[in-house]
């Protein structure tokens, strides 16, 4: 495996590559043909993640967003995005875990969010796992993408019997993204100053991100962008699972592009990134 990783060349992802995976609607489309994303994010500890993931997904462009919650989180999402639906139903893709602790019993709403995660196995559609849902990696039958940072990936691998520290992962992100993809049987987007998207025999490298992206909620925005793209590309992903990596790379490219537009070399917030998602997409297509 070590020799294979050393020889593996990464594909440098560009705007031209991204354009291929942004589905522009035609006059024949309607809301249900443009992708329905099921979202299970946010908790009492991190309620803002529910809003950020939902707003980012809607800003990216999709047909329907279904937010799954039996708590006050639904009211927060509806206040910020009245176009969201807040009842269960058929979905074309899942986004789960952002703003949810991996400590299932830390509080009542977190426990409830983990119960909602079980819906992912009931509808076998392409799935994005973040933060508190990362432990589902390798446990689902559908094409699955995980979006950890180094600390989360280290914890996940240690729990699966692979001893590694977050410092080691940060020192060689390329290697560990590929190790994780092979050992877990999923597509891995490893977040960092340089983001890698890995499958065992397939590696994409994103341009170095603006340092201003190191801000609270930025990862939730990324998850929402990718979730929307997965829902609009779900047929392509089911036909060729490598497209999940390409769609994830497109989401990361849009995320950084929106951050650059929002920043102009000055501080930004997660909310300000969302405002520039449509402009970032317009420049790509």
Predicted features and spans:
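Small-residue (G/A/S/T)-rich helix-start motifs and N-terminal tracts that mark the onset
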Residues: 1-128, 135-142, 155-285
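Non-cysteine beta-strand/loop elements that form the S-adenosyl-L-methionine
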Residues: 144-151
């Amino acid at each position: 495996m070590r020799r294979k990783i050393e020889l593996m060349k990464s594909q440098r992802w560009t705007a031209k590559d991204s354009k291929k995976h942004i589905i522009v609607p035609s006059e024949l489309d309607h809301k249900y043909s443009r992708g329905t994303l099921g979202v299970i994010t946010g908790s009492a500890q991190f309620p803002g993640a529910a809003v950020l993931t939902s707003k980012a997904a809607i800003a990216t462009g999709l047909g329907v967003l279904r937010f799954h919650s039996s708590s006050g989180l639904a009211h927060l999402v509806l206040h910020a995005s009245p176009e969201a639906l807040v009842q269960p139903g058929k979905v074309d893709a899942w986004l789960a875990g952002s703003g949810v602790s991996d400590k299932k019993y830390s509080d009542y709403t977190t426990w409830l969010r983990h119960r909602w995660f079980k819906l992912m196995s009931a509808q076998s559609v392409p799935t994005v796992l973040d933060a508190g849902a990362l432990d589902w990696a390798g446990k689902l039958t559908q094409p699955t993408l995980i979006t950890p940072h180094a600390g989360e990936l280290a914890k996940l691998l240690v729990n699966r019997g692979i001893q590694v520290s977050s410092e080691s992962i940060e020192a060689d992100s390329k290697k560990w993204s590929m190790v994780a993809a092979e050992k877990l049987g999923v597509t891995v987007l490893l977040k960092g100053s340089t983001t890698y998207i890995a499958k065992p025999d397939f590696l994409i490298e994103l341009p170095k991100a603006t340092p201003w992206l190191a801000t609270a909620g930025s990862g939730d925005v990324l998850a929402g962008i990718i979730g929307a793209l997965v829902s609009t590309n779900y047929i392509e992903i089911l036909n060729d699972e490598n497209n999940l990596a390409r769609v994830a790379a497109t989401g990361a490219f849009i995320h950084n592009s929106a951050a650059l537009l929002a920043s102009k070399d000055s501080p930004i917030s997660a909310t300000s990134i969302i405002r520039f998602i449509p402009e970032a997409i317009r420049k790509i297509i």
